[in-house]
Amino acid sequence: MFFDSYDTPVFRPPSEARSFILRVTRGCAHNKCTYCNMYRGVPFQILKDEEISRQIALAAHYGKNKVRRVFLADGDALVLPTAKLLKILQVLREQFPHLQRVASYAAPKDILRKSEEELRQMKEAGLKLLYYGMETGDDATLKAVNKGVDGEQAVEAGRRVTASGMKLSMMIILGLAGAEGSERHALETAKAINIIKPTHLSALCLMLYRGSELLDQYEAGKFNPLSPAGLMRELKLIIENIDLPADRHCLFRSNHVSNYVQLAATLPHDKQRLLRDIDYSIAQLSKLKSWDVYNYN
């Protein structure tokens, strides 16, 4: 549920479907990634305290004892000053006695503006989970898609979150480097995962969105996307090179609308079974004679 008064779409992870969506910002502070059109045309704005309080009051009025989870929207709530975030978290704890978890998207530049201690304070105040779109660990690909950070910074952002004790749900995008950069993208992303050690890992497939620069590049013949089987081969190379400690449990999912195949595993325990599932998927997808290169679902 959500109670904001804006007419722009609200985006949230699938696992936040039953959460109270509390909009604390509008749009995305970066809003320059070439593959994304989520907030194009939406001026970035930090909502006033009065508007945030109004949403919380309405949610408390209609479901004070029902709210278990809260998701802070829009694209990068962590851009807020730490003091303001801590105040919001305090109010949420006061208003919702059965609150179990607060979560948010987090952009790498916003994470890097926070110290480990600040992240730890927010975790203790109730911000238990961050959804982090690292997308890739590869320098060249990050630069090409205008992510705003390099590989070292992308890794440090993720590492800082896990070091604070927060849960980290990290997202990567299969096919982001195109056919030419696929192997490099896969290997560097696996290296990043090994350093960060996320608690959750989601592999999405590239979608060429209307209004994105990457779509323009494809239509101009400057970007060569992977086939569905090629996307699975890239995922196989990533999984083959993930080397997590036996006592570190990472929940892997590929259940986004962009995925051709839904996969689930706990790494490193299920690594070999996951690789067998991927091999089967490659064999089946290789039979496709045509597919929607835009990956519109």
Q: Across the structure, where does each feature detected by a protein language model lie?
A:
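Auxiliary Fe-S-binding modules of radical SAM enzymes
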Residues: 1-16, 194-297
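Canonical Radical SAM [4Fe-4S] cluster-binding loop centered on the CxxxCxxC motif
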Residues: 7-54
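Hydrophobic faces of well-ordered beta-strands that scaffold small-molecule active sites
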Residues: 20-22, 70, 100-104, 130-132, ...
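Conserved, mostly hydrophobic/aromatic
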Residues: 28, 36, 52, 72, ...
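Aromatic/hydrophobic pocket-lining residues that form the small-molecule binding cavity
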Residues: 52, 85, 115, 154, ...
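Conserved SAM/AdoMet-binding glycine-rich loop
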Residues: 60-163
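Conserved strand-turn element in the central/C-terminal portion of the radical SAM core barrel
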Residues: 109, 137-141, 161-185, 204-210, ...
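Catalytic cores of alpha/beta
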Residues: 117-119, 177-195
